[in-house]
Amino acid sequence: MNKDNILHTDTNIKITLFSEVSIGISANSALFFSHLFMLFEKNRSKPIDLYIAFLSLTQLMLLITIGLIAADMFMSRGRWDSTTCQSLIYLHRLLRGFTLCATCLLNVLWTITLSPRSSCLTTFKHKSPHHISGAFLFFCVLYISFGSHLFLSTIATPNLTSDNFMYVTQSCSFLPMSYSRTSMFSTPMAIREALLIGLIGLSSGYMVAFLWRHKNQARHLHSTSLSSKVSPEQRATRTIMILMSFFVVLYILENVVFYSRMTFKDGSMFYCVQIIVSHSYATISPFVFICTEKRIIKLWGSMSSRIVSI
């Protein structure tokens, strides 16, 4: 894949990518400020608000970063130097790792919070925020340290076209690395992502079992008219399942597109599709949070009424 092929990528792909980034930035901004306001209001705030606010902030920064990278991919106006390339590529990789880590730990915290009193997870309910904060800091340090090789492998794109370089944008490229060096950096990253995806799978499986058991108990304890009402626990559980199912599907699809890109010599189209797929969760997940969280709707309603009264 060379830089000329990226410039001449189909216009519909470009429009889709920039639309996704714009919508995602707006949605994550709304979600972040909503939870930020709720954190300052003691009667509305919950411990999980801080983690959702951090996830939305991370996704917001991720989409801004990929927006800058995409602009350099399709609009060859000016050229970045090596320092700018290294900083943006490293920041993007770091924010992607933070997003995966925050999604996993938020899912685990949600699972512990919604678990019934008879569950073995009850003992972690009061300790979980502190433990999860510590785990998050641990994974952040890992991502910061293991991503430092990007400063060595990222350079400003040379003027001469070469098949040895892997073009990222019009200004930035990856230096070719040996198989042993590639394995040395990719193996820890694969293990780390497998661990986080495994935690997401386990906690999601637990929530499926909880939802199924809760539904069966409702059939025995209530009449049909009463059991049709959805409890807050069921609503929250379904929100988790929608988000995590969507996350896992996109993660698998992203890897399929990535290997397809590696298979074909001219993978400019696959490269753009991979970017769109890999950032779809950051764009769509805020809408799921906003639509299923009644507190946000009430907050916006109260703020609108205050503005109208003024």
Curated annotation (Swiss-Prot):
Intervals, Cytoplasmic compartment: 41-49, 115-131, 212-238, 291-310
Predominant location: membrane
GO biological process, one term: response to pheromone
Topology relative to the membrane: Multi-pass membrane protein
Entry annotated with the keyword Aminoacyl-tRNA synthetase: no
Residue intervals annotated with topology Extracellular: 1-19, 71-93, 153-190, 260-269
Spans traversing the lipid bilayer: 20-40, 50-70, 94-114, 132-152, 191-211, 239-259, 270-290
Keywords in alphabetical order: Cell membrane, Disulfide bond, G-protein coupled receptor, Glycoprotein, Membrane, Pheromone response, Receptor, Transducer, Transmembrane, Transmembrane helix
Disulfide feature: 85-172
UniProt keyword ATP-binding, yes or no: no
Tissue expression from the record: Expressed in 1-4% of neurons of the vomeronasal organ. Only one pheromone receptor gene may be expressed in a particular neuron. Not expressed in the main olfactory epithelium.
Pfam family, one: V1R
Residues with attached carbohydrate: 159
Cellular component GO terms held in the UniProt record: plasma membrane
Location relative to the cell: Cell membrane
Molecular function in Gene Ontology: pheromone receptor activity
Function: Putative pheromone receptor implicated in the regulation of social as well as reproductive behavior.
Similarity field: Belongs to the G-protein coupled receptor 1 family.
Stated name of the protein: Vomeronasal type-1 receptor 97
Organism: Rattus norvegicus
Gene assigned in the entry: Vom1r97
